[in-house]
Amino acid sequence: MYAALRKAFFLVPPERIHTWVFAGLRAATTAEPVRRRLARRLAPHDPILASTVFGTRFPGPLGLAAGFDKDGIGVHAWGALGFGYAEVGTVTAQAQPGNPAPRLFRLPADRALLNRMGFNNHGAGALAVQLTRTSSDVPIGVNIGKTKVTPPEHAAEDYAESARLLGPLAAYLVVNVSSPNTPGLRDLQSVESLRPILSAVLAETSTPVLVKIAPDLADQDIDEIADLAVELGLAGIVATNTTISRAGLATPGVDALGPGGISGPPVARRALEVLRRLYARVGDRLVLISVGGIETADDAWERIVSGASLLQGYTGFVYGGGLWAKDINDGLAARLRGHGFSGLAEAVGSAAR
């Protein structure tokens, strides 16, 4: 059924249909009786899927990745739609419009998206107000980025301001230094640049702090960031963001679309490689959140047994529809029982042991 609906959706420009569908999801879940009925059908209720991470109970491991709900206006909806948590943002200390449109594109032959949104958001202060006013049935993480006009030498203060405003309201914070759509942002992934940023954020909040990294980093850089995260006492790493690589794409005319990051199956292989490398490096000293190209329960299971405590998806939701999260949750529960695990935490990293 969703395949036919998706065909209709894909006749509309991507950013416009995102706005319409997102508004529809929010409206449909505003009334508590409707939200409860949806949650009974879609939410992860099976106790085998639940785990405690950062001292917070997550009813299921699959969360909505940052980028879908940038300003936290849909936090009431995500639990009822099957997600065990959601990460809002990316938000910046100052409001900004992002890059000019068009800035979001479909790559249908690859079941992928290309975006160069540029951290369009209403600012950390507005998100803080929104989170104060709105309740959620599931944990809400917040992804923070650098304001575009802030020079790199003042990046630490910029991130720290967002952490100050949002830390008390978030289950966890993610420092995003890996989007390809803000000029110079990925340069902040070098250990020399990253150390003062992470230190400033950690000094500003007691909320668990993670860093989100790019799939395009060299293996040595991944190792250095992992070591820095352990040294500074970060809670974990989110791996990975979108890729700038165009290798192996089946959709014609991608180069004509211009720059941007690609999400979905084209990043899956590298995201899994990075996850495995990180787990081999840090083991259970850091929480690893795996994102990038997760489409099926098999994909999700492979990430769990490779070391991910939590998972995220966005592009899979776009292509998979409203039952996508439920299907993955049901598949994970079946695999956990089939392999003799009594809970999700037992399976994390089991393929590496």
Swiss-Prot record:
One Gene Ontology BP term is: 'de novo' pyrimidine nucleobase biosynthetic process
On whether Membrane is a keyword of this UniProt record, the answer is: yes
Entry binding sites for FMN: A66, G67, F68, D69, K70, T90, N143, N176, K212, T240, G264, G293, Y314, T315
What cofactor does this one take?
A: FMN
User: In the UniProt entry, which residues are flagged as the active site?
Assistant: S179
Q: Which UniProt keywords apply?
A: Cell membrane, Flavoprotein, FMN, Membrane, Oxidoreductase, Pyrimidine biosynthesis
The note on the cofactor says: Binds 1 FMN per subunit.
Its EC number is 1.3.5.2
Reactions mediated catalytically: (S)-dihydroorotate + a quinone = orotate + a quinol
The coiled-coil regions, if any, are: none
What family name appears in the similarity comment?
A: Belongs to the dihydroorotate dehydrogenase family. Type 2 subfamily.
Subunit text: Monomer.
This protein is called Dihydroorotate dehydrogenase (quinone)
Which organism was this protein described from? Mycolicibacterium vanbaalenii (strain DSM 7251 / JCM 13017 / BCRC 16820 / KCTC 9966 / NRRL B-24157 / PYR-1)
Q: Which gene encodes it?
A: pyrD
